[in-house]
């Protein structure tokens, strides 16, 4: 996988263009970006932190891994996929304060 220097606007644009497919195929209600790319602190080896909320009944390992693979291919970068309701309490406030949701 190529490690390209990309920015938050490029990531958001790619996710917005693919948003309908992500929601329909992977049963996602919300998707957003947080972490180093949002803060402008990404390095050449940084992964992209993505926060998701799955539709009820679709939060399973198989769907999670399919979405992770799809996002890594779409964004041409490693993705750290985080399920919103699984965020540890000590990280929740920071993540929710910095997340940029797609549409």
Segments (PLM) and residue ranges:
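Conserved histidines in hydrophobic membrane contexts and catalytic metal-binding motifs
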Residues: 33
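Short hydrophobic/aromatic beta-strand micro-patches
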Residues: 51-53
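Catalytic core of pol beta-like nucleotidyltransferases
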Residues: 1-30, 38-44, 55-103
């Amino acid at each position: 996988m190529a490690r390209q220097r990309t920015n938050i606007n490029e990531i958001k644009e790619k996710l917005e263009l693919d948003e309908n497919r992500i929601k329909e195929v992977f049963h996602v209600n919300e998707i957003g970006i947080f972490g180093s790319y949002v803060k402008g602190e990404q390095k050449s080896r940084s992964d992209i932190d993505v926060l998701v909320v799955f539709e009820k009944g679709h939060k399973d390992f198989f769907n999670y891994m399919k979405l992770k693979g799809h996002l890594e291919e779409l964004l041409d970068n490693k993705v750290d996929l985080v399920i919103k309701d699984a965020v540890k309490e000590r990280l929740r406030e920071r993540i929710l304060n910095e997340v940029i949701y797609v549409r």
